[in-house]
Amino acid sequence: MLATLRLFLFFLPFFHLHTFADDCPDWAAARASSEVVALQQQIDRWDDAYHREGRSVIADELYDQSRLRLNQWRQCFNLPSPPEPLRTASGPVAHPVAHTGLDKLHDAADIATWLRDRQNVWVQPKVDGVAVTLIYRDGRLHQAISRGDGVRGQDWTASAKKIGAIPQQLTQPQDLLVQGELYWRLNGHMQARAGSANARATVAGLLGRKDLGAEHAAGIGLFVWDWPHGPRDLPERITALTQFGFPTTVPYTQAVASLNDAQHWRDHWYHSPLPFATDGVVLRQSLRPPAERWQARPPYWAVAWKYPFAQALADVRKVHFKIGRTGRITPVLELSPVMLDDRQIKRVSVSSLRRWQELDIRPGDQVAISLAGLTIPRLDSVVLRSTERADLNVPLASDFHALSCWQPTPGCESQFLARLTWLSGKQGLALPHVGRGTWEKLLETGRLNSLLDWLTLDGPELANIAGLGERSSARLLHSFHSARQRPFAQWLKALGLPPTGQATLADSWQALAQRNTEQWQAEAGIGPGRAAQLSAFFRDPQVLTLSETLQAAGVDGF
C-alpha cells in the first residue's frame, strides 16, 4: 500500500490561497454542502487509485490545488474538516526526528518579511519528490522510513537498499540520520517549460510497490536537505555529508543576503535545466534548534517560496459563445482569475463547439488550464463538474455560416460585429481610428442596422454618440468618407469574398456576379468547393443588396 500519499497535505492550513479568487462562492448552504461533498469524493477516488494501484490519475499540482480548493470551500461555509488527510500515510515506524514540513509562501512581499530579521540564510531548490529518513549504523544503511505524517512512516528499507543513489555504506563508520527527498531523475528538466511532469507521483508509486525493480530503482535520485544532529553551520553539514558519500548538494545551496538574492536563485533554477522537478525554493537559516525539539509542523527557521503553477485549477464563471465572421462558433470560458507563470488569466478558449459539446462545460465547473508556448492560455481538461448544471443558450452550428448575419438581429450580434471588425481592419479597408470598440459604440446607439449604414452617418450624428468627443468624431467621419475611395479589390475582401487563389478577377461587380460555378472552377487554384462558395457569395440576396448600396455611394467597381 502506498505510504506517502500527497506529502504536503498535512500542512494545508499554512498555504496561501493567492492562486484562487479571494471571494467565496455565492452558494446557498445546500449547494455548498453538495459541492464540497462532490470534490471530496473526487479526491477520494484519486487517493484510492494512488493508494491501491500506485498510479496517479491527475497531475500533482492539480491534486494539490484541488485540496486547497476543498479547504477554501470548507472555510468559506464553516463546514467541518474531514479526518486528517495523512492518516493513511502514517505507518508503524517512528521517526527518531520529526519531519517538520514547511510554510508555503507565494509572494515576494511575504518572503521579504520572513527574511527581515534573519541572518545566515541559504537557499536550495525545493525538489519535488517524496521525503524520507535514512538511518545509518556504523556507516551502513540500517533503515529507511517514509515521511508519513511526520511522526511515523512506513518502512522503506527494502526498496532503499536497491536504489543506487542512496549510499549503502558511508566512507566512515558513523551513526547518522539524514532527511532528504527521493526524486525521479529527469534529464535537463526546465521547470518553467515542463512543469512537474508528474515526477512526484512517479517515484511515490514506485516506492509503494512491494518489489522495486532494478531499472526503476536506477531512475530514483536522492537530495539530502538536512542532517538534524550535524554541525551547527549549514555549509559544514553539506561538506561533511558529501565526504560521507552522499550526492553533493553544494551547487544547489547558495547564500542569501537579501530578497534580490532569493529572487535571483528562484528565477535561475526555475528556468535552468536540472536533474529533477522542483516546485519552488527553500530558504533556511543555517542555525536551528536541537533536533529533539523538532515537531511535525512548519518551523520558524525554514520556509518554501513556491513557483507559479504551470497548470492551474480554475473556476468557470460563465460560458460565452463567440461567433466569428465566417460563422465559426468558439466557446470561451470566463474564469475566476488564476495565476499562471506570474500572469493573471481570466478567460480561455475551448477551441470549437464540438469540443465544448464533448466536455459539456458549465458555470461552476473546475477546469485545468496551462499556457501553450508559455503565452496563450489553453484549456486542458475538466477536473470537477458542478453539481448543478446551468442551462445555456447554445447556438446551433447549422444557423451560422459564411453568408449568415448581415444584420444585428437577435442571435446575430456576435457575427455581425465580427463582420464590421473585419471590414475596417487591415484585412479589409484598413480604416484608421476604427476598431471593434468603435463598432460596439455605434451598435449600442442603434445606428447600424446593416453592414454599410455607417456610410451615411454625418458629423452631428457622430457628435451625439456618448464617448465620442469632437476630435474623435471628426477623425471617425474622415475615415468613413475615405472608405469610398478604397479600390474595388479591397472592398471585395472587406465584404468577405471567399479566397480566390490565383484567379484573375474582373474589375467590376457585374462581371464577377455573372460567373457560374463551372467558370469559377476553371480559374487557377480554385477547386469545386471554393467555386461553389464564390458562386453562392455573388448570388446571395444580402450581398447583392450591399453591392447596390456601394454602387449608389459611388464606390469604384460597383
UniProtKB/Swiss-Prot annotation:
One record GO biological process: DNA repair
Pfam family, one: DNA_ligase_OB
Keyword DNA damage listed: yes
Domain of life, source organism: Bacteria
InterPro entries, alphabetized: DNA_ligase, DNA_ligase_B, DNA_ligase_CS, DNAligase_adenylation, DNAligase_N, NA-bd_OB-fold, NAD_dep_DNA_ligaseB, NAD_DNA_ligase_OB
Catalytic activity annotation: NAD(+) + (deoxyribonucleotide)n-3'-hydroxyl + 5'-phospho-(deoxyribonucleotide)m = (deoxyribonucleotide)n+m + AMP + beta-nicotinamide D-nucleotide
Keyword Transmembrane helix: no
Function: Catalyzes the formation of phosphodiester linkages between 5'-phosphoryl and 3'-hydroxyl groups in double-stranded DNA using NAD as a coenzyme and as the energy source for the reaction.
Entry similarity comment: Belongs to the NAD-dependent DNA ligase family. LigB subfamily.
NCBIfam families per record: PRK08097.1
Name this polypeptide is given: DNA ligase B
Species this chain originates from: Pseudomonas fluorescens (strain Pf0-1)
